[in-house]
Amino acid sequence: MPSIHASTSELFTHLTVSNICVAAGCAFALSLLYLYVRALYLVFFHPLSRIPGPKYAACSRLPYVRNQLRGDLVKWLHSLHQQYGDVVRIAPDEVSFISNVWQDVYAAHNGEKATKGTYLKDRRWFAAPYNNTWSILQADAEAHPRMRKMIAPAFSDKVLREQEAMIQEYVELFVLRLHEQTENDSKGDVDMVKWFNFFTFDIIADMTFGESFNCLRDSDYHPWVRMLFKSVRAISLNSAIRRYPFFQAIVKRLAPKNLLEQRRQFNQFVFDRVGERLASESSHPDLMSHIKKFKDEPKGMNRDEIDSNANILLVAGSETTATLLSGCTYMLLSNPEKLAKLTKEVRGTFNHPSEVTIKAVSNMPYLHAALSEALRIYPPSPAGFMRIVPGNGDMIGGHWIPGGTSVSVSQWPANHSDSNFTMPNSFVPERFLGDPRFEKDNTSVLNPFSAGPRNCLGKSLANVEMRLIMARLLLDFDLELIDPEQDWLDQKSFTLWEKLPLMVRLKPVRRYTAPA
């Protein structure tokens, strides 16, 4: 017969297990109730509840994250704007616009608008810097103008004119290497994405710390550039998990050691090059030479700030330009009539490569129009430049948006909206040349380099590179797509486009002696 002690112990154990089950059930029920009440609040009572959009996106960020991680965010946003209009709530605390609200969100503000505060970058979109120091891309309201004062002169029109000889050396090497491709076993069949990358990465490295990546010299990617391309998808993953600290901690803990080592090497390479350049007495007019002018001033950049800025400028000043050049080439070759017009302008303007100068290509209307149209259809940064609404809130495009909300003009959806453009999906450079068919186009919504005091520092450099390369390419070669049936623009985007190879057949134009 069991003892009273044993019976009591069994009863206690049974009650304890029962209590735990009841407690767990209550906790689960309360969690469901909380989520239900929270969803009701977000959908029907939140200050953003008046903004159009799907209810599932209003009560959870998961649909946004799902499309972000799949590389479909831009096209998902486009479908939402087609359904709901110019302004859409795409997450509980995020709103996307495709109307012209650049002045409201991105411009420098005066008067009453200025009293509301500055629209700062949404840092949740960016990976935490390796050295824990933000670059000019994510800097706060105090640090940004201080950094910009030191960096901007390196990319001014004046400096670019002074640097023309250096830039032209890379243009010549680019053309020479392509001529070599027509003479070897490839028979002129080349991946233009690769060659545009070689060109832009070499130039930005030279302009940042006076040392080329030598991609064009070696006809191959530098190891640092290869590491960059391998990390593109991780940018979107990092942005997604930053919204969920718990998962962020798990990912950091479980990240393979080889990936962590690659990230260390990626950053260390830049830090080492910066250190060597700062210690050098070279007078080479690169970014570091401009930064060194401020080294003894109280507001000069410290070493961590210099490292972070060099890192971000190498990426922002190369990949985006190569992307646009690739897209423009594809669109021209897919539209023979437009290609013929631009080729006629180029070959009617220049008789010899030596005539293709920065000044000369600045006066070519159809070239400018073709590049502008390519930027519209295929913006290198296809999503929006995220900003945080300051203070208690502000009016944006006629809508009251509460403070703390992340807002942006979603570029690809805006550029492909028939509310902004006639024939939005067609490559028609004439829309920028006064063609009356497009007189109702809302071109003010186009800002591929952003706008306001935080617009892209490298806009002038990008324009110079794009114009020179496109002019020389069409002067030296006849081009055709190897696979004209391929829809090359059908790509995933992970902050940047995940570009496919762009296979093109080059045929030299024997109008003069090719570069030797």
UniProtKB/Swiss-Prot annotation:
Requisite cofactors: heme
Localization per record? Membrane
Q: In which pathway does it act?
A: Secondary metabolite biosynthesis
Question: GO cellular component annotations, sorted alphabetically?
Answer: membrane
Q: Which PROSITE patterns match?
A: CYTOCHROME_P450
GO BP terms: namely: biosynthetic process
Q: How does it sit in the membrane?
A: Single-pass membrane protein
| Entries under Pfam families matching the protein | p450 (PF00067)
Q: According to the UniProt record, what class of enzyme is this?
A: oxidoreductase
**Presence of keyword Kinase:** no
Against Gene3D superfamilies, the record matches this protein to: Cytochrome P450
Q: Which residues are glycosylated?
A: N131, N184, N415, N420, N442
Q: Where are the transmembrane segments?
A: 20-42
Induction info reads:
Expression is positively regulated by the leucinostatins biosynthesis cluster-specific transcription regulator lcsF.
Domain of life where this protein originates: Eukaryota
What molecular functions are annotated in GO for this chain? heme binding; iron ion binding; monooxygenase activity; oxidoreductase activity, acting on paired donors, with incorporation or reduction of molecular oxygen
Q: Which residues constitute the signal peptide according to the record?
A: none
**EC number(s) for this protein?**
1.-.-.-
Q: What is its main location?
A: membrane
Q: Give me the residues that bind heme, please.
A: C456
Alphabetically sorted, this entry's keywords are: Glycoprotein, Heme, Iron, Membrane, Metal-binding, Monooxygenase, Oxidoreductase, Transmembrane, Transmembrane helix
Its biological purpose = Cytochrome P450 monooxygenase; part of the gene cluster that mediates the biosynthesis of the lipopeptide antibiotics leucinostatins that show extensive biological activities, including antimalarial, antiviral, antibacterial, antifungal, and antitumor activities, as well as phytotoxic.
Instruction: Spell out the family assignment given in the record's similarity comment.
Output: Belongs to the cytochrome P450 family.
What name appears for this protein in its UniProt entry? Answer: Cytochrome P450 monooxygenase lcsI
